[in-house]
């Protein structure tokens, strides 16, 4: 049977202390979780708060299996990269359109930017108030490969590549590509 309980507090403390010692050397922290308990919420909160205090970019993704998962638990991050299903699970909403859905997720999670993965339909880009014009931006980019042979790891690749773009101060379109 699959165990989905959080890792024990002593191991959480070891992970956090390791990050704490090295945080000044970091430009980016990626949080990626399959919701099996490794990233307990207390640990996630501590890592996010530490990153914010040290001006380290933090980006997150989550793999939701069955009915388990809540991508919004990665609050106040620079970038979230959920699937439509993960976003719907997080805000418990199966009815609203994509723009309403992603804005509700952005408000709940307080994420600065969201790249909503739409599978064969591409990506929905959504960002909160841009500093320059105080507008919310939403756009869609279609798929680059219309006939993929193997999609294993595609979401992980998107998380890593878009997170590195965030570090290089790319705009939202550069980040999405």
Predicted segments with their positions:
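Core Rossmann-like FAD-binding/catalytic domain of the broad FAD-dependent monooxygenase superfamily
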Residues: 22, 87-88
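Conserved N-terminal subdomain of the carbohydrate kinase-like
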Residues: 1-30
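Conserved phosphate-binding/catalytic region of the ribokinase-like
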Residues: 14, 25, 32, 42-57, ...
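Glycine/threonine-rich flexible loop motifs
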Residues: 36-42, 90-92
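Active-site donor-binding loop signature of nucleotide-sugar glycosyltransferases
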Residues: 2, 82, 141-144
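Residue-level signal for inorganic ion chemistry
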Residues: 29-32, 83
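Active-site beta-loop-alpha junctions enriched in small/polar residues
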Residues: 2, 34, 63-65, 85
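Non-cysteine beta-strand/loop elements that form the S-adenosyl-L-methionine
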Residues: 76-85
């Amino acid at each position: 049977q699959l165990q989905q309980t959080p890792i024990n507090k002593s191991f959480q403390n070891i992970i956090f202390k390791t990050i704490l010692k090295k945080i000044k050397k970091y430009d980016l922290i990626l949080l990626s979780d399959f919701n099996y308990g490794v990233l307990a919420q207390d640990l996630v909160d501590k890592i996010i708060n530490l990153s914010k205090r040290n001006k380290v970019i933090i980006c997150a993704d989550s793999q939701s299996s069955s009915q388990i998962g809540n991508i919004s638990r990665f609050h106040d991050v620079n970038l979230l990269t959920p699937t439509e299903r993960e976003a719907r699970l997080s805000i418990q909403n199966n009815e609203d359109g994509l723009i309403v859905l992603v804005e509700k997720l952005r408000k709940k999670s307080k994420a600065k930017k969201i790249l909503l993965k739409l599978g064969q339909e591409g990506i929905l880009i959504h960002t909160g108030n841009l500093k320059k014009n105080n507008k919310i931006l939403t756009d869609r980019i279609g798929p680059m490969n219309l006939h993929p042979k193997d999609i294993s790891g595609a979401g992980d690749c998107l998380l890593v590549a878009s997170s590195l773009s965030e570090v290089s101060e790319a705009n939202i379109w550069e980040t999405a590509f």
